[in-house]
Amino acid sequence: MFNFANFYQLIAQDTVLQPWLNTLPQQLTDWQNAEHGDIERWIKALKKIPEGCADNIDLKSSVTLSNNTPLIDGERKKLENLLQTFHPWRKGPFTVHDIHIDTEWRSDWKWDRLLPHITPLKNRSVLDVGCGNGYHMWRMLGEDARLCVGIDPSHLFLIQFEAIRKLMGNDQRAHLLPLGIEQLPELNAFDTVFSMGVLYHRRSPLDHLIQLKNQLVAGGELVLETLVIDGDENAVLMPVDRYAQMRNVYFFPSARALKVWLESVGFVDVKIVDECVTTTGEQRSTEWMKHNSLPEYLDPNDSTKTIEGHPAPKRAILIAKKPD
């Protein structure tokens, strides 16, 4: 189904990542053996995606692939239909041979907010936890990261990632593994670790922060982005049921409380670098994600609240270091 051999070969040559081979192949074999109702249809479409047909690739200012000679209308429409097979597209946007994949999230806005604050990624190894379809990994490569490893257990996100990678000519600097953070050993291997949009899905947020720290080299940097509420260092919201129609959500600290949490598990130089209310321009339904989105999740009479009566989504970005 999926061939991870290139990644195995890559980490076999890396003395820091090599021990991962003790557990990773069996985990990925188990994942592939698990049934998924849509996987055959998606793989059939993936096989029809043309390989490496982009003359120009821009990962610095966007994720854009183009040819010097544009595709004819029939070829472009065929490619668009294949890519639509992988609906819904949640993270992006991507522009592929004049096809604009207008995703639910303007993930480029988040990237623009965090980029000025992080250590430059040039020649760094990066782990992106809960990476979705890998949009931000391509932007990391645009900043000259040496290696980007993303983890996310979703079948559809892996298919979308492999479709874009195939169009780029199978770039081997980025790899998406269908795993959760709890399946990773303590690698202590990555220069930068990103966790964006994950913390509020964890029953034990402090354990998640420790798991992230255990993936970093000494002196490595964590980039943490999550939903927050207003308040002091003691403020935390724990929704009784849903939040903005999301299930499986647990803890929404204030940014100041989150800073205390990070320090309590051993991070240093913790900084709150951005707080931003999520707008319906940043998250909304599109032709590439036709399900309900943020506009339907807010109180129709008061956009400062969710339909459950909680504060409307606000996200914070914090930067922290693992001690040397």
UniProtKB/Swiss-Prot annotation:
GO terms for molecular function: transferase activity, transferring alkyl or aryl (other than methyl) groups. Its EC number is 2.5.1.-. It catalyses: carboxy-S-adenosyl-L-methionine + 5-hydroxyuridine(34) in tRNA = 5-carboxymethoxyuridine(34) in tRNA + S-adenosyl-L-homocysteine + H(+). It comes from Aliivibrio fischeri (strain ATCC 700601 / ES114) (Vibrio fischeri). Gene3D superfamilies: Vaccinia Virus protein VP39 (3.40.50.150). It comes from the Bacteria. Homotetramer. GO terms for biological process: tRNA wobble uridine modification. HAMAP family: tRNA_carboxymethyltr_CmoB. Catalyzes carboxymethyl transfer from carboxy-S-adenosyl-L-methionine (Cx-SAM) to 5-hydroxyuridine (ho5U) to form 5-carboxymethoxyuridine (cmo5U) at position 34 in tRNAs. This is tRNA U34 carboxymethyltransferase. Carboxy-S-adenosyl-L-methionine binds at residues 91, 105, 110, 130, 152-154, 181-182, 196, 200, 315. Belongs to the class I-like SAM-binding methyltransferase superfamily. CmoB family. Transmembrane segments: none annotated. Pfam families: Methyltransf_9. Keywords: Transferase, tRNA processing.
